[in-house]
């Protein structure tokens, strides 16, 4: 069929009254699904720690499986976000091109029908949308940091771990010498709710640092030899210290059970 014989135009500009429907066109929001999956991974890590005997030599294989799943999920999420951004750009470009076209009316109908005037076609733009570049996972999350250090602090909750600039790196950590104290330097008691400073990375228990900063907007960091000035809003939850303390308590409990059992055997 010749173009002039088309009974209706191939495409026409977006009608002003259809803007509401056009606005509602979007990629499906999968953010809640991804957050649920991440939550399940965090729960799996907690279950692994809770259900594994502290005397177990290593949990590297289980951690590697969870890490692989987490990285795959993170990549899918990045691809989903990238697709969503492409759809937004597509709609923006389509709207701009459509708005530049003469509106469809009795005087322009035949011109659009014959092809003398043309308007963008959303379906064609979508089919010709550039393929997104391979997505990269988010590589600096608390969960990835925990997965990276878990095999090491499982064996020794007090081991010194280097700063994790890129926890997604496949290289093994080079564990440093020395020991990490699992007691707050302010309260001198075991951590209950450890908070870490985003300025200097020093850790204090919530009650301790709150009492130290009470009545002050800012104050010198209470850690000896630290030159930073801190405020309460500089502190965030420290999941790695929480994990250290949890594993240390489990190991101590097992040691107490072992000593009690040995005492009974002696009797």
Swiss-Prot record:
Task: Read off the Gene3D superfamilies from this record.
Answer: 1.20.120.1010, Zinc/RING finger domain, C3HC4 (zinc finger) (3.30.40.10)
Q: In which pathway does it act?
A: Protein modification; protein sumoylation
Q: Which UniProt keywords apply?
A: Cytoplasm, DNA damage, DNA recombination, DNA repair, Metal-binding, Nucleus, Transferase, Ubl conjugation pathway, Zinc, Zinc-finger
Against SUPFAM superfamilies, the record matches this protein to: RING/U-box (SSF57850)
Tell me a GO biological process for this protein. protein sumoylation
GO cellular component entries? chromosome, telomeric region; cytoplasm; nuclear envelope; nucleus; Smc5-Smc6 complex
Q: Which domain of life is it from?
A: Eukaryota
Q: Which PROSITE patterns match?
A: ZF_SP_RING
Q: Where are the zinc fingers (SP-RING-type)?
A: 169-256
Q: How does it assemble?
A: Component of the Smc5-Smc6 complex which consists of KRE29, NSE1, NSE2/MMS21, NSE3, NSE4, NSE5, SMC5 and SMC6.
Q: What else is known?
A: Present with 2800 molecules/cell in log phase SD medium.
Q: Which family does it belong to?
A: Belongs to the NSE2 family.
**This protein is called what?**
E3 SUMO-protein ligase MMS21
Its source organism is Saccharomyces cerevisiae (strain ATCC 204508 / S288c)
Species lineage, top-down? Eukaryota, Fungi, Dikarya, Ascomycota, Saccharomycotina
Instruction: Give me the gene this protein comes from.
Output: MMS21
């Amino acid at each position: 069929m010749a173009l002039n014989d088309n009974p209706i135009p191939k495409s026409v500009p977006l009608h002003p009254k259809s803007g509401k429907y056009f606005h509602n066109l979007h990629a499906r929001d999968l953010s809640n699904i991804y957050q649920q999956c991440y939550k399940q991974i965090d729960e799996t890590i907690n279950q692994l720690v809770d259900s594994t005997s502290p005397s177990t030599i290593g949990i590297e294989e289980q951690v590697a499986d969870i890490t692989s799943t987490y990285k795959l999920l993170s990549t899918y999420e990045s691809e989903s976000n990238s697709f969503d951004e492409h759809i937004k750009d597509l709609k923006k470009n389509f709207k701009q091109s459509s708005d530049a076209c003469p509106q469809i009316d009795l005087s322009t109908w035949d011109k659009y029908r014959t092809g003398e005037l043309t308007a963008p076609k959303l379906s064609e733009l979508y089919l010709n949308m550039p393929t997104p570049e391979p997505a990269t996972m988010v590589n600096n999350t608390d969960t990835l940091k925990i997965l990276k250090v878990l095999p090491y602090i499982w064996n020794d909750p007090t081991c010194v771990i280097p700063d994790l600039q890129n926890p997604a790196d496949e290289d093994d950590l080079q564990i440093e010498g020395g020991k990490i104290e699992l007691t707050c330097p302010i309260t001198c008691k075991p951590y209950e709710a450890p908070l870490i400073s985003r300025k200097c990375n020093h850790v204090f228990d919530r009650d301790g640092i709150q009492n130290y900063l009470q009545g002050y907007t800012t104050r010198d960091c209470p850690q000896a030899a630290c030159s930073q000035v801190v405020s309460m809003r500089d502190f965030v939850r420290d999941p790695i210290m929480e994990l250290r303390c949890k594993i240390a308590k489990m190991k101590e409990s097992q040691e107490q059970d072992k000593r009690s059992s040995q005492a009974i055997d002696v009797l």
